[in-house]
Every structure is written in C-alpha cells, then in structure tokens.
C-alpha cells in the first residue's frame, strides 16, 4: 500500500473515531468496546455460517501471531518517542536552554487556551487531518517528480 493509501485509510479511520467520540459524546473506551463487540459478533456469525455450509476455514485465527522482533520493534519505537518527549521537557524544565523553555511554554499555553475553546477530540482530529494532508501532498509531489524523470508530460 502506498503512502497515499495509508493517508486515506488513516483519514477514514480517524473520521470514524471522531464521529464516535465527538458527535455521539462517547468515550474511547466505549469505542474499543463497540469494535470488539462487532468483531466478536461477526466472527461468531461467520463461524456458524461456515459450519452450516460445511466450509473449512483455511487459517485458524488463534494461530495468528506476531514475531518477537516485531513486538520488540513496536515497544522500542514507543519507548524512543516517550523518551524523546521526556528529554525535551526535562531540558526545558531545567532552564538550561532558554529558547526551548520559551517554545515549550508558548506551545503549552496555546494548547491550554485551545483546549478551553475546542474539545480535545476535535483538536486531535484536526491534527490527524493536517497530518494526512501533508502525507498526500508529499506523495503527489513525489509522483510528479518521478513522472518528470520518466519523461512523461503532465497536463
């Protein structure tokens, strides 16, 4: 799946989460519960249907596993992200870097003021939309550069 497909999939998923959390005034926990209920019900119905039609399931979902390297990679990336944020806040809090301290204070003040005006879910959704737009923009620029290198004429 290309970067454009990832951006569109992320935008669709984010829109569904935003609709569930913001428009229905539901929590993220209720969203996770609803998703698990739908998945469980779908698997149960498919299992009954396959059993009734005497269709064998080619892959047992209980055998699906991720490798230990993949799990370690996911945890390492999460730890690096949290560690980087923690180190930036630690340096800003000690006051050794005055410019960083001012940037962090301005950013936190802006987020606090924005949080009083707009709900957190709306802010997160707007950030997701901006992120997806930047991914789509980078992908379209990359495609146009590749097309020009290949000698194709763009309209």
From Swiss-Prot:
Disulfide bonds: none annotated. Keywords: Endoplasmic reticulum, Membrane, Transmembrane, Transmembrane helix. It comes from Arabidopsis thaliana (Mouse-ear cress). It is a multi-pass membrane protein. This is Reticulon-like protein B23. The chain crosses the membrane at residues 30-50, 117-137. It is found in: Endoplasmic reticulum membrane. It comes from the Eukaryota. GO terms for cellular component: endoplasmic reticulum membrane. Residues 1-155 form the Reticulon domain. The keyword Transcription regulation does not apply. InterPro entries: Reticulon, RTNLB22/23.
């Amino acid at each position: 799946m290309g970067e454009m497909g990832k951006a569109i999939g992320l935008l669709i998923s984010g829109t569904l989460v935003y609709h569930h959390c913001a428009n229905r005034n539901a929590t993220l926990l209720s969203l996770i519960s609803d998703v698990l209920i739908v998945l469980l019900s779908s698997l149960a119905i498919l299992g009954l249907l396959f059993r009734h039609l005497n269709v064998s399931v080619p892959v047992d979902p209980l055998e699906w596993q991720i490798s230990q390297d993949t799990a370690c990679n996911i945890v390492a990336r999460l730890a690096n992200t949290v560690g980087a944020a923690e180190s930036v806040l630690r340096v800003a809090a000690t006051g050794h870097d005055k410019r960083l301290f001012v940037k962090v204070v301005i950013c936190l003040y802006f987020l606090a003021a924005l949080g009083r005006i707009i709900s957190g879910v709306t802010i997160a959704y707007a950030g997701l939309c901006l992120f997806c737009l930047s991914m789509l923009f980078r992908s379209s620029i990359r495609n146009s550069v590749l097309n020009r290198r290949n000698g194709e004429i763009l309209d």
